[in-house]
């Protein structure tokens, strides 16, 4: 996960730099959703070097893991952090994605950057949203109607609700 995030961060940085180089950064809406429904606790109390051991009910021991410590995160490993770290990653919420009834298992961070379109800057929002709300948000931001037909194919109405109502009003319901 850390390697994925580092790679993602580098490439998002390249995209942001390119948009800034053409002078359109403040006029570009960037929506970044970080995560995939909370961290995973499959690593148990000590973590695991290879998630296949979990699926095959093989218990990894600390003495098995320590000699491989420098290999963790490499292209031939499928490690999981320990459950303690998983809970820490989901702070301030409780639990992990294995416990969907708690916010640690269901909430992800989202950043919306659009200085020319959002008056509020650097504020936190607590309204609930879903990934299905992103397309309606972009359409409203661009003042575009929802497509009813694409290349002659009639489209079903979009699910989701634009988030524009909450971007300038932290107290919006």
Predicted regions and their residues:
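Short glycine/proline-rich turn/loop motifs
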Residues: 1, 113-119
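A long, amphipathic alpha-helix that forms part
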Residues: 1-28, 39-41, 45-86
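A generic secondary-structure signal for well-formed alpha-helical elements
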Residues: 8-9, 15-23, 37-45, 114-115, ...
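Structural beta-strand/beta-sheet cores of well-ordered domains, especially the beta-sheet scaffolds
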Residues: 26-31, 89-91, 108-110, 127-130
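Short, solvent-exposed turn/loop segments enriched in Gly/Ser/Thr/Pro and often Arg
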Residues: 32-39, 45-47, 100, 153-156
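C-terminal cap/loop subdomain of S1 sulfatases and analogous C-terminal strand-loop tails that border
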Residues: 75-103, 118-127, 132-173
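Active-site-adjacent bridging/hinge elements
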Residues: 105-115
């Amino acid at each position: 996960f850390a390697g994925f995030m580092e790679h993602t961060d580098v490439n998002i940085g390249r995209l942001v730099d390119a948009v800034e180089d053409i002078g359109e950064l403040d006029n570009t809406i960037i929506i970044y959703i970080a995560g995939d429904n909370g961290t995973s606790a499959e690593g148990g109390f000590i973590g695991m070097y290879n998630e296949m051991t979990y699926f095959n009910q093989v218990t990894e021991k600390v003495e098995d893991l320590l000699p491989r410590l420098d290999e963790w995160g490499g292209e031939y490993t499928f490690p999981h952090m320990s459950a303690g770290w998983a809970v820490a990653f989901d702070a301030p919420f409780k639990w992990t994605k294995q416990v969907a009834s708690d916010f640690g298992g269901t909430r992800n961070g989202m950043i919306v950057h659009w200085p020319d379109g959002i008056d509020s800057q650097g504020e936190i929002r607590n309204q609930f949203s879903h990934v299905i709300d992103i397309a309606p948000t972009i359409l409203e931001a661009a003042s575009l109607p929802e497509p009813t037909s694409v290349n002659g194919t009639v489209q079903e109405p979009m699910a989701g609700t634009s988030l524009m109502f909450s971007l300038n009003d932290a107290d919006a319901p």
